[in-house]
Structure formats: C-alpha cells, structure tokens
Amino acid sequence: MGNSDPFLTYLKSFGYSVVRLPRIDIRPLQVLVREDTRLTRLGNLETILHPGPQVALPRMTENIAAANISGERTRDLSLGVGLSILGSVIGAMGGSQMGLDVSYQRAKTVAFEFSDVLEDRVDLADIDQYLTNADIAAFSSHAAKLLEADSIYVTTSTIKSRKFIVQASETSGSPIEVKLPEIQKLVGAKVKVAAAGKSNSKIAYEGEQPLVFGFQAARLFYEQGRYTAFKPMEPGAGAFEARQAAADYLVTDSPFVRLDIP
C-alpha cells in the first residue's frame, strides 16, 4: 500500500519523491544504505563501487529544463501541509518562516506551482552497465555486506528550482490575496517575494540558489559479490525529512526510516 501522507506524495504525479527540507547538495550517483530502520548517505557511487576496466562512471546530465514539471500545479493541499512545505522552502533559502501562518490565516488550502525547474539525471541503463562491470572497493568490507543484503540505493535524478509559486484559497475555493510588503518583511532579504500574476493571490518566493526538492532513486541487488539487478523506488514512497541540524530522514510507507547526511 502506498503512503497516503499528502506531504510525501504531492510530487508523486510528476514521478518524484519529496525532499522535505530542500537542499543544494543532493545529486545523482549518491549512495544510500539501509540498516534496520535507518538510511544513511554512504558516499558517492564511485567511492564504494570502483569503475571496471570497460565501463566508466556514467556521465551526469545537468540543468535539463524539466518541461513536464515547470508551470505545473500541485493539487490543493491543506493549509497545515502547505505552510509546512512553504516554511521548509523559505528556511532552505535562508529566510524566516515565523509569522507565515498569520499572513495566510484566511486560507483553507494551498497549491504550489513550480517555475524554471531543472533536472540533473543519470540514465538507469548507464548505471546498470556501470554496475555490471564495477568492483566493490577493496577496503569497503562493510559496504560489501550491505550490498549482499540488498540495502544499497543510488540516486538517479533530482529536480531543483530557485522559484516556488504559492496560491492560497479560502473555503469557497476563491484565491485570497496577501500583503507582499508584510511577507517580504517576515521572510527577510535573502528571499525575494513578488506577485506571480496580475493580483497578489499568486506569490513567487525566489532564493539565490536552486534547491533540490524532488528525487528518484533505485535499489541495488547483489549476489555473491556481483551486481544482478536494480529496482526503481516508487515515486512518493519516501521523502527526505530534516528533523535536526545534523540529520535527515527518509520516511516510507512502512516504519520510519532515518537518513543521516554527514
């Protein structure tokens, strides 16, 4: 059964899982490992699985215009979920989220629109060929055990943007207008706040750097020290979730899975 948490699944229709606290340092070809209920970022793929003599590390294609996501709108989310997402975005931009609930106090629902979305990706077919020829690093004895336990995942695609557009609506479904100067003062100078339409009902929040807000990953399967298969992670089945400064978490539809990022 899939996860029904609207926070975890609001990108599912676009084929991505959610980064609860958007970051700049999530990218393809990063290795995640699952131990019991914890997923920890282990390092880069080539550090754990050295390139073989015939197939080099796959080339990552960066900053591809994600036309299937740019300009698209999420479904209406509850005010609490929407403000939680918006707060995490503003926080990642270096702004303050204190007082946002007051600015949107008349709202019942919130929807997001993604602008100028860029994708970084590596084709799974290339990763498949690389892994078939790669060798487990000689000094990665623990990683070898984790591979045999099918506990390793690799990120394959990330989506990022500098600008996130928000539209809030009241119970009747009518958009509500907010006070731009008031919100700009609340969030601070690091976040640019501007109307994204003819009225102040659709607001664009823009930061200085593109933030990764969605990702795709694949689980790797090994047998007797050799790679055998991969399985793409189902969109919406997990999400990066920041719980404290030094740790992130991956939430799944089964027990909570913690993702620590050094």
What function would you assign to each model-found segment?
Residues R106, E170-V187:
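Compositionally biased, low-complexity segments of secreted and virulence-associated proteins
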Residues G2, R20-P28, V33-R38, V55-A65, ...:
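Membrane pore-forming effector domains from diverse proteins
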Residues R258-P262:
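Short acidic DE-rich linear segments
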Residues L45, H50-A92:
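Glycine-rich, hydrophobic membrane-spanning regions of integral membrane proteins that mediate transport
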Residues G94-M98, K185-A189:
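Outer-envelope beta-barrel architecture signal
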Residues D76, G95-Q97, T171-G173:
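Extended beta-sheet lipid-handling architectures
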Residues Y10-V19, I26:
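N-terminal segment immediately downstream of the Sec signal-peptide cleavage site
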